[in-house]
Amino acid sequence: MNNPGSRAGTLLHFRVVAWAMWDCGSTGLNAIVTTFVFSVYLTSAVGQGLPGGTSPASWLGRAGAVAGLTIGVLAPVVGVWVESPHRRRVALSVLTGTAVALTCAMFLIRDDPRYLWAGLVLLAATAASSDLSSVPYNAMLRQLSTPSTAGRISGFGWASGYVGSVALLLVIYLGFMSGSGSQRGLLQLPVANGLNVRMAMLVAAAWLALLGLPLLLVAHRLPDSGAASHPSTGLLGGYRKLWTEISAEWRRDRNLVYFLVASAIFRDGLAAIFAFGAVLGV
């Protein structure tokens, strides 16, 4: 006779693995698109010969600032909106699908200055979509864990993200970038018109789509224990609720508010280093 407890434990383990796989796919895509490959491609190849006194790296910084501002405005209210568990799968599916579609569209960006603006728009939109998708993703942790297991499961997802980024970087480097001359990588793709980089973007998009799909398929089956305590809130209602909660916290413990602001600035600083490290190093 099957043991119901064992079956439930196996199902939970599968859901945790599916949850971690999404992080593996998302972090890998971010490493390729925003840090090491596409951003460098825009500044070192697409933007070469750009008329005017502003360098491609400066335009990249402005695009990143727009993406960061968008995330800063939308992420808190998205967090309020997805407090209802049934909304998390919808938000995660839409934002993940958007990031995949935008990354696929990067295949159209040739190494010509006329394509720089479109490339910057795609880069900023992908960065914003990918970052916002982490909001419903992180909210799902409460549906997968207890207070005693939250740290272990969260760490497993975090580690999976690093493994995914390193693994995809190796795949892209060995298959599409290594070597010199007019053809690169083990696939011997031509560098003319940036074809090797453009093909790499399709691989990065497929990486997120394949690794993110298991979570999207099981997300609607996650426990909805918090649904009753978090009634549905509209977008504008989310801003009102957010302001109410911040005001209440400010009156209760201002040090916590200071900490949240400082941690946000710290994370943004790290994100800027990650985004521009490869660009400045080329």
What residues fall within each predicted segment?
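Juxtamembrane intracellular "pre-TM" segments in multi-pass secondary transporters
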Residues: 2-17, 220-261
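Central cavity-lining transmembrane alpha-helices of secondary-active solute carriers
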Residues: 37, 57-82, 101-102, 166-169
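C-terminal ends and interior cores of transmembrane alpha-helices
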Residues: 93-114
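A single, central transmembrane helix in multi-pass transporters
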Residues: 247-282
